[in-house]
Amino acid sequence: MRALPTLDSLARMRPPLGDPRAAEDTLTPRPANKSAVERLAADRAKYVRSTLGSSRGPVSEHRVPEAPGVQHRNPIPSALAPAPVARRAIARKPLRPDSLVIYRQKCEFVRGSDADCSRVGLMKKFFQGSGKDKMAVAPETTRVADEDKTTKETEATWTKSSQAAAARPASMLPPPTPVVAVKSPAEKTRVANEDKTTKETEATWTKSSQAAAARPASMLPPPTPVVAVKSPAEKTRVANEDKTTKETEATWTKSSQAAATRPASMLPPPTPVVAVKSPALPFEVAPRVPVGCSGVQLRVSRSKGLQRSQSDLSSRYSIAKAESDTFFKYCGLDPDVVEALGRENFSAGSDCVTLKVRSVSMAASDSSFSRHSEDGLQEEELLEQVPSTTSVVERNARIIKWLFTCKKAKETPSQKLQGPA
């Protein structure tokens, strides 16, 4: 597709009527009209500085030469002749190697065992860069090659020396060079002082052992006792434990001596300890037993190796038995009650004790107890009864039953109390 000529150009191209050569000019073939791109390329030399245009001359000079016998009156067709287009030279990058070259280089890299193949980068070897990149990489490659060469030479030297040492006998081998550790002056001084002190100590021990071996055993000094160094807190604790142990031993000794000197009848009755578990259970009457040492004191006495004699143990058991007998003799009553009733009234063969106990306890109770009750025994009938001897177990059982009845009557005042059966 080409541009159509304008009316002005057609009028100029039309030859005059009186010209005899107009028909010839009209019949001769004329060059095609230039397109807009061709006209722009022809006018480019006017406003673009190009090395190519300057070397070849202006673009307007490149015109199609006319025939010598043909003369054109109109200069426009010659100006419309196509002119060569000046193009700028573009620097292209080097092309990448084809796949075959890459494959060959990869095979050489894998097959080669030298350090050069392992040191050089695979990417730098495959893809060629510009001249500047090659110049920048060249010193590094040279340094790596030098290091590899030095390493190979060192390994070869060591291999030769080891083979030569293995080939010749041991008698021809040179003596090993001693390894001397370099020490600082302060370290040397400290080591010298330690060596000097060690030598002096050894000399002193040697002299003392020789002197001890030379003189007889009678002249030898007594051995120095080894004293364990204790802290102040440890000393205080041990002193307190010793003091407590001594006080406990003195107390036991005095009590055993006093119990051995006076008879069992003069021993004071123990105070019963009553522990109420629940309203449905009776009182638990327990005799007063001498309180023993605490756990710490027992451990201290055991650690000290304290041993009781046979007489001490027998006195302790006799005291416990005497107190138990006293408890059952006075029916577990308090000492003031026993004094009020009179100690002479408590005898093993008397049944009047039950009556006395009944009368005293009922006077102190808050219950509505009447002496003349229909369910229980009357006081006159008790006095008329003939005393009979009862066992200790039976008497204690009656007393415990009676105490339980008193407790229930105290809780429920409507219930009537009875004396011990």
Swiss-Prot record:
Q: Which GO terms describe its molecular function?
A: alpha-tubulin binding
- Which residues does this entry mark as bearing Phosphoserine? 350
Q: What are the Basic and acidic residues biased-composition ranges?
A: 143-155, 185-202, 232-249
Q: Which Pfam families match?
A: FAM110_C
Look up the record and report any one GO term of the cellular component aspect: centrosome
Places the protein is found: Cytoplasm, Cytoskeleton; Cytoplasm, Cytoskeleton, Microtubule organizing center, Centrosome; Cytoplasm, Cytoskeleton, Spindle pole; Nucleus
So which domain of life are we looking at? Eukaryota
Q: Which UniProt keywords apply?
A: Cytoplasm, Cytoskeleton, Microtubule, Nucleus, Phosphoprotein
Region Disordered: what ranges? 1-36, 51-80, 141-266
Q: GO:BP terms for this protein?
A: positive regulation of cell migration; positive regulation of phosphatidylinositol 3-kinase/protein kinase B signal transduction; regulation of cell projection assembly
Q: How does it assemble?
A: Interacts with AKT1; the interaction is transient and follows AKT1 activation. Interacts with PPP2CA and alpha-tubulin.
Known role: May play a role in microtubule organization. May play a role in cell spreading and cell migration of epithelial cells; the function may involve the AKT1 signaling pathway.
Spell out the protein name for this chain: Protein FAM110C
Q: Gene that codes for this?
A: Fam110c
